[in-house]
Structure formats: structure tokens, C-alpha cells
Amino acid sequence: MTFKLGLLSFWSLWHGIVLLTNLCEGLKVVRVLPARWTFASKNYDAIVRATEKYHPAPWIPRLLFSGVLIWQFLILVGFGWAMVASVQSGWMDLEHVSIAFGLSLSLLAAFIIVDELCTEYDTEHGHILFFIAQLVTVIALAVLPRG
């Protein structure tokens, strides 16, 4: 259980950091945080650059970024729920774990599709690696023995 809980904790922490850096990025965009603030993801600018070839309305990148923030918040809630349920039950609560990883993998799948649509192949490579790493983790959590 300790190894599995460690894997779940790692991905929970990683998702928390990702959400926090994206929140800081969003706060920079709306000028709540100063432009010199360094703890920010730069993902909003990446969305603007990736979509500019399609000449979207100015509000489209903000809507996309806001949607990602909401999705990432739900992922973090899912991982928190999976952690609490697993600790309380004394073993991996695979139902809650599956929900958390399902939310995360679905966001990564959406990123991969959008990367392809926007021909952002370098970015897509990173998303594919995260997708594979999370898929391997969820399989390990399901297949490895309880002990």
C-alpha cells in the first residue's frame, strides 16, 4: 500500500503544482499579479500562440485557458478524493483512483488532439509522455498486489 500511496501522492502533488502555476499565470493575465512574477506556467501564452494561426476572437484563448483551469481543479479534487478514500479503506480505492486518472487522462487526450489540430508537435510530445506515464501508473495501481 505504501508504494501505491506514494504513486498516488506523487501525481496528486504534481497536479497541485500544475494547477497552482496555471492559476498564477491566469492572475498575471488579468493583472492581479505583476508581469515580473516568475512562478507561473506561461501556458496562456502558449495557447495564444497555438491558436493565432486560426485568428480567433480575443476571448477564445481566455475561455480555453479558463476551461483548463476548471478541469485541472476537478482533477485535483479527484486525486484528493482518491487519496482520502484509499487511506480510509486501507488499500487502493480503485473506483476513486480510476475517476481521478480518468479526469487527468481525458485532459491530456484533449491536449494531444488540440496539439495535433494546431500543429504543436513539440508540445504534443510532452503531453504524450505524461499520458503514457499516468496510464502506466494507473495500470500499476490496479495490477500490483496489495502488499
Annotate each language-model stretch with its function.
Residues 55-64:
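Select transmembrane alpha-helical segments in multipass membrane proteins
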Residues 1-21, 63-70, 74-147:
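Extended, low-polarity transmembrane helix blocks
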Residues 31-34, 38-48, 58, 89-92, ...:
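Short alpha-helical interface elements
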Residues 1-56:
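Long, hydrophobic N-terminal alpha-helical segment
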